[in-house]
Structures are given as C-alpha cells and as structure tokens.
Curated annotation (Swiss-Prot):
SUPFAM superfamilies: GlcG-like. Belongs to the UPF0303 family. It comes from the Bacteria. HAMAP family: UPF0303. It comes from Burkholderia cenocepacia (strain HI2424). InterPro entries: PduO/GlcC-like, PduO/GlcC-like_sf, YBR137W-like. This is UPF0303 protein Bcen2424_1558.
Length: 165
C-alpha cells in the first residue's frame, strides 16, 4: 500500500461522492442499500448514517457486536472533527508517526482514526454528517462505504476504488 497514493485517491473520492441533496428518505435508501450489500457478502458489520447531531440509519448485521457500535461512534467522531474520512486521517497520522492523542490531544476512547467513516457531503452545504461501517479490516470498511456511495450516486466504483494492495 502506497500511503501517498491512497491519500490522493481518498481526496478524489471525497470530492466526487457529493449528494445534490440529502434527507432522511435518502439516508434510509442508502442504509438499506448498504445492508443488502453487506448481507449478500456475509459481512458481520454495523452501519451508521448520521447528520451531525441526528441519527438517520443504524443496523447491526448478524455477527456484529457492541464493540462495532463503539468503533462506529469513534470513527464518526473523527469525521465530525476533521470533515475528512477517518481512513484519510489515519493514514496522515501513520505518515507523521503520530496518533490523534499526540498530535491533536484527542482521546483514544472517543476518536478512532481507522478506516470506515466517510464524510456525508452535500453540494452547496459541505460536510453535514457521516456514513460509517465497522466490522471489516479498516481499508475494507472504507471501501465498503465508498462502493455503496458510488452505487447510490451513480459513479463507477472501479474508477474511484483504492488500488489493490
């Protein structure tokens, strides 16, 4: 895995995966799409869609644990704080040889810079929330969310996917 290349690709994902508008009905549709995709693949994950301050969709699939819910919360907090994907922030920390606690004073009990939470961005409004998955390895969590967003927004996932490591 080339961190610099992944960071560039994640930046392109974040720029491309923007909703023209977003409301609870769209959250429900996206959440159900993610649930169906995860179920078809046998993923034991938790899925979470929020606007900051308001939960819109949550599902824990068979095999997901309460620990996944806590990872969701901590990853979501990273997106809320930085307005970037949790995986991008984690890769930046890895590049710097630092942690969120070291560099930003953010407690590990509240923030997890691991892949899986992606900014929910609306054209003209910016980042208004997050879409999060937890239960797979962090890169796979990130790509699961990106793949679902591509399908929801009509983008070609093959174009936006991270390079295979």
């Amino acid at each position: 895995m080339d961190i610099a290349h992944d960071l560039q690709s994640i930046g392109a994902q974040e720029q491309a995966l923007v909703f023209p508008h977003f409301d609870p009905a769209r959250a429900w549709a996206l959440g159900n799409r993610m649930h169906a995709l995860a179920t078809s693949r046998g993923h034991a994950i938790a899925i979470d869609i929020v606007t900051f301050g308001q939960p819109l969709f949550y599902a824990a699939l068979a095999g997901a644990t309460p620990d996944n819910a806590d990872w969701v919360r901590r990853k979501r907090n990273v997106v809320a704080h930085f307005r970037r994907s949790s995986y991008a922030i984690g890769l930046r920390m890895q590049q710097a040889g630092a942690t969120l606690a070291d560099k930003h004073g953010l407690p590990v009990a509240e923030y997890a810079s691991h892949g899986g939470s992606f900014p929910l961005t609306v054209a003209g409004a910016g980042v208004i929330g997050s879409i999060t998955a937890s239960g797979l390895p962090q890169r796979a969590d990130h790509e699961f969310v990106v793949e679902a967003l591509c399908a929801e927004l009509g983008h070609d996932y093959a174009v936006l996917a991270l390079a295979r490591s």
